[in-house]
Regions:
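Single, function-defining residue in the core of a domain
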Residues: 1-35, 42-43, 85, 96, ...
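Short, positively charged, Gly/Tyr-enriched micro-motifs
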Residues: 3, 21-79, 144
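Generic detector of ordered secondary-structure context
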Residues: 44, 61, 132, 277-278
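Short, contiguous clusters of charged residues that form electrostatic/catalytic patches at enzyme active sites
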Residues: 50, 135-138, 170-174
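Active-site-proximal, Lys/Arg-enriched surface segment
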Residues: 66-147
């Protein structure tokens, strides 16, 4: 019990110190609000205002705490200042070859009826990937060099039905710009197949990228136009390697690569494919990183 109590106080002290740093230049009520939100999320493991409020254990009615936090959220206008402090507080912990991850997710509001600009989204948490009401989320993180922990540098909740909406690519490019601004140097961007888009590829050409391809993608294989998926099925992986997963599962896979050309910009890239991750389909990746040997393939 003593160790548990000590750990709790240590966690709270670290959260308070962090909040103090990212609150530089804002007034005391907003600083208190930031501390309450950060500690409430950490202690409750939830982003619901009601759960955050309960974990603050204030000597007032729960309703009053909820109303205070909601009021502060509605009137909060120090986002740019806090974000700047946040980036400065984290510092440069990304190493000489930083890796950024980009992901589109969703927030499902299954029972929501009156939320503003409710959109149709694919519920990624459901097994059948059903369509529900909710919002899209665009996120970019940079991995720390040593611990490989993700540090969020861009997070945007949006709806395709809002008046301000232009395109999903607009938010993706803003998330890429956020990484560029934070790092100020060349990095490797990792994207899932939802980002298999010529505009994204062109936008990332000044940096390194690794993008998972969809099965419909067509490339030039030695001048001839061919479907990437059909072509990869004909080729065997030449490099054997073992992958470890979080549940201590080991899987032996076979990896190889080949040069391809994109028809739309006539630029050469490396196509890396992996057999064995799924019994049904190989994993297909496109990258602008140069591959000269086995180590380069494994690195991708």
């Amino acid at each position: 019990m003593n160790n548990f109590t000590a750990n709790t106080y240590e966690m709270k002290r670290e959260i308070m110190n962090f909040c103090k740093k990212i609150s530089r230049g804002v007034n005391k009520p907003i600083t208190k609000f930031i501390k309450d939100i950060e500690y409430g999320i950490a202690s409750s493991g939830s982003c619901l205002i009601s759960n955050i409020s309960r974990n603050l254990n204030e000597n007032i009615k729960l309703k009053n705490t909820i109303e205070r936090l909601c009021g502060n959220l509605n009137n909060f206008n120090d986002t740019d200042k806090v974000y700047k402090n946040y980036i400065e507080t984290i510092g440069d912990v990304y190493g000489d070859e930083p890796v950024a991850l980009f992901d589109d997710s969703d927030i499902s509001k299954i029972y929501g009826k009156k939320f503003e600009d409710l959109d149709d989204v694919i519920d990624a948490s459901s097994l059948d990937k059903k369509i529900t009401k909710g919002y899209h989320v665009c996120e970019s993180v940079i991995l720390t060099e040593k611990e490989k922990q993700p540090i969020s540098v861009y997070s945007k909740i949006y709806s395709c039905k809002s008046k301000e909406f232009k395109s999903m690519n607009e938010y993706t490019m803003k998330s890429i710009d956020a990484v560029k601004n934070v790092l100020g140097r060349k990095f490797t961007g990792v994207f899932d197949r939802g980002y298999d888009d010529n505009k994204i590829i062109d936008y990332m050409n000044d940096n390194y990228f690794i993008i998972r391809m969809n099965d419909r993608r067509v490339f030039l294989f030695k001048v001839k136009k061919k479907n990437a998926y059909e072509e990869v099925l004909k080729r065997k992986g030449k490099i054997r390697m073992t992958l470890w997963f979080d549940d201590n599962e080991e899987r032996e896979v076979y990896v190889s690569h080949t040069k391809v050309t994109l028809p739309h910009n006539k630029k050469d890239y490396e196509l890396v494919f992996c057999h064995g991750l799924s019994e049904e389909r190989p994993l297909i990746l496109l990258t602008n990183r140069e591959i000269h040997n086995k180590e380069d393939v494994i690195k991708v």
